[in-house]
Curated annotation (Swiss-Prot):
This is Large ribosomal subunit protein uL16c. Component of the chloroplast ribosome (chloro-ribosome), a dedicated translation machinery responsible for the synthesis of chloroplast genome-encoded proteins, including proteins of the transcription and translation machinery and components of the photosynthetic apparatus. Partially alpha-N-monomethylated at Met-1 (10%), whereas 90% of it is blocked to Edman degradation, probably by trimethylation. The modification N-methylmethionine is found at residue 1. It comes from the Eukaryota. The lineage of its organism: Eukaryota, Viridiplantae, Streptophyta, Embryophyta, Tracheophyta. Keywords: Chloroplast, Methylation, Plastid, Ribonucleoprotein, Ribosomal protein. GO terms for cellular component: chloroplast; mitochondrial large ribosomal subunit.
């Protein structure tokens, strides 16, 4: 699963997801892509599940690019812990995704295979997405 090698700080504020994605919203590498339509935190496990589903479905042919990276640590407090005594420990990593962001790209396969692979990857995502074609 994806996670940063090292970060400057162990814990982060939650922040908020306002507006649309102005970066990473165009197809850069492949021919077909999966684009987010809603804002969400996508965990490294979900990213990996989508990537695996796409590679299994595309089989030998085709190249896949993952265009998001989980660089935000999410902290969780232990169960049945009283309030106070600081922030919880970092538990997992998420990628902050805004509407319009490209999640995956694929090329080197026929459109029907790409559609099928992307649809399976989309079912692993916690948000509504759309299939787009470059050009």
């Amino acid at each position: 699963m994806l996670s940063p090698k090292r970060t400057r700080f162990r814990k982060q504020h939650r922040g908020r997801m306002k507006g649309i994605s102005y970066r990473g919203n165009r197809i850069c590498f492949g021919r077909y892509a999966l684009q987010a339509l809603e804002p969400a935190w996508i965990t490294s496990r979900q990213i990996e599940a989508g990537r695996r589903a796409m590679t299994r479905n595309a089989r030998r042919g085709g190249k896949i690019w993952v265009r998001i990276f989980p660089d935000k640590p999410v902290t969780v407090r232990p169960a049945e812990t009283r309030m106070g005594s600081g922030k919880g420990s970092p538990e997992y990593w998420v990628a902050v995704v805004k509407p319009g962001r490209i999640l995956y790209e694929i090329s080197g396969v026929a459109e029907n295979i790409a559609r099928r692979a992307v649809a399976i990857a989309a079912s692993k995502m916690p948000i509504r997405t759309q299939f787009i074609i470059s050009g």
